[in-house]
Amino acid sequence: MGGLLEPYIDTQKGYKLYSPKGWNKFESDPGVYDVKFQDVIEPETTVQVSTSPVATATSVSALGDLPTVGAKFAKSRNAELVKAEESDVEGSLVYTFELKGELYHELLALCINRGKLYRVTTVTSNKKWPKRQELYKNIVASFVPKGF
């Protein structure tokens, strides 16, 4: 990952991913995020991970099919749904969406595992997206929800 990323593991919340090296790290803003990484120079450029309990759903597919969920997120953010993909990460279905707003670009991943909804959100300006998209794709692709 070119030395730009380093491993981050949250054993209490049960996930791991690569995070940007040298960015500011903020722990838990309840109801908003569990951890946030923020670019030192461009504070609007962030990576956030949040978890919330789910009572009955065991898969992100319980939220709806991929296009429907993607369209809902795009509408709620007044953004265009550029791409929607699903993948299997160690037995858990993950939905990934690329959204483009008027001023920003967002890569978002959703997964339900062990009674929790996991959300990984990466945001940067549209101007910076061409330079940052590979970094963000690597971060989202590195996300693994599992017990430790």
Label every model-predicted segment.
Residues 1-4, 24-119, 124-128:
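Conserved polar/disulfide-associated segments of primarily extracytoplasmic proteins
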Residues 4-16, 133:
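Short aromatic-glycine motifs in intrinsically disordered, low-complexity regions
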